[in-house]
Swiss-Prot record:
Gene name of the record: tusC
Similarity remark: Belongs to the DsrF/TusC family.
Subunit and partners: Heterohexamer, formed by a dimer of trimers. The hexameric TusBCD complex contains 2 copies each of TusB, TusC and TusD. The TusBCD complex interacts with TusE.
Cellular compartments annotated: Cytoplasm
Annotated HAMAP family: Thiourid_synth_C
Organism per entry: Sodalis glossinidius (strain morsitans)
Keyword Cytoplasm: yes
Protein name (Swiss-Prot/TrEMBL): Protein TusC
Cellular-component GO terms for this entry: cytoplasm
Keyword Metal-binding belongs to the record: no
Pfam families: DsrE
Main subcellular location of this protein, as a coarse class: cytoplasm
């Protein structure tokens, strides 16, 4: 079985990487059973609740991350160091219940995947 990892490294606004990655993730979930999703660097910002993209005339796609469990995508990881660097902690309000990992731990988990797609 092919294990596929999606790594989100860009924030929710400013470019389309997050939205395109989410679209690819949802499409792939129909074809693959073992998918891991990693949020690192500015990618951790994708999971923050209470975003107001309409204020900058952007589409609100972040809430769609909340439906990943309906697609049986349950291996969700957030880089604790990336969150801390941005002044965020577990109480910040998140759209997903991702497992918080140190940089070393998420690198180890990521190495177990056959294919890695970065957005």
């Amino acid at each position: 079985m092919n294990r596929i990892a999606f790594v989100f490294t860009h924030g929710p606004h400013g470019d389309a990487a997050g939205r395109e990655g989410l679209d690819a993730l949802l499409a792939t979930s129909a074809l693959a059973e073992d998918i891991g999703v990693f949020f690192i660097a500015d990618g951790v910002l994708l999971l923050l609740e209470q975003q107001q993209p309409a204020q900058i005339l952007a589409r609100d796609f972040v809430a769609t991350f909340g439906v990943l469990s309906l697609y049986d995508v349950d291996s969700l990881y957030l880089c604790a160091e990336s969150a801390a660097e941005r002044g965020l902690d577990a109480d910040a309000g998140w759209v997903l219940n991702a497992e918080w990992l140190s940089a070393a731990d998420w690198r180890q988990r990521l190495s177990a995947y056959d294919t890695v797609m970065t957005f």
